[in-house]
């Protein structure tokens, strides 16, 4: 898949999903082989997002793949799937030489006309990727899944999925299975707003998957119901930053990693060779304030996920891997991570079990936890 002038999205691309106010800081992290950037508006400012993109491309000479996500499907004022695309939004992406993503509204669980509408309207636009911001029932429920994959096959256009969930959508039963069904439709598939499961998607054939810089960009947060009359408004509570803990393939609070480390001073498990940690134990960030650890936590996480991607899908010799090798390796990594989680006394991330259950058979049996 290519944009007319922006760098090509090659198979197995691991993107960073950030908001426009983070884009300049994220650009260096996203500029390496097999990486790239997805940028969503900061506080719904689409004009600001376009200006940021123009700056990145023209002044900053950003050379990795760049995608713009209008995110009109998100937030309290989100638009429904039936909302028409904004022709100016589509045109501006084209003028910037970028891959074109539709500015789709949200596809609720009962909204088959909305789903079909997005795909039909995309099919008549040359070289455009249909953004599908989905209620998780579209992947979880067998009947929904059949309808979804039927419409995707019929339209035959590339799709970029965004999955709604309070936390990790891949923790929900049926979501991994549903994603694999979409990947089996034979259209180029991207996954936006994701976390560690981005790697699973890439190993199973997604063209690209994007990992969010902050929790709010690692899934589509459901709209909160309006407060009950007379209920006390609860204030905004900032979320303490989490970081990817490589042995358990999961995002963990830095404090939780530090506590586990005190109980088990095992250098093999806690040392991190990423460019941010530079050989230090990963909980070095615990000494920083929540505010100061946000940037290193994000950079560490992206670097670790990029390294894992390179190990699972070696970019220098992709054709040497027999088909299914990456998916089998991913299943084996999930089994190992589940074992490591139990060893540390943590609940394993539920997605680990779902990926193993639906991965290539026999892989888990071949897994031996690393010494
Ligand atoms: Zn690190």
Enumerate the predicted regions with their spans.
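Conserved, mostly hydrophobic/aromatic
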Residues: 201
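Short hydrophobic/aromatic-enriched beta-strand-loop microsegments
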Residues: 37-40, 206-217
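Donor nucleotide-activated moiety binding/catalytic core segment of transferases
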Residues: 172-187
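Catalytic or ion-translocation cores adjacent to nucleophile or general acid/base/metal-coordination motifs
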Residues: 212-228
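Active-site beta->alpha loop and helix N-cap motifs at the rims of alpha/beta catalytic domains
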Residues: 1-166
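C-terminal amphipathic alpha-helical segment
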Residues: 226-280
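Glycine-rich beta-to-alpha transition loops that act as phosphate-gripper elements at the mouths
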Residues: 18-21, 189-197
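C-terminal extensions of enzymes
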Residues: 266-371
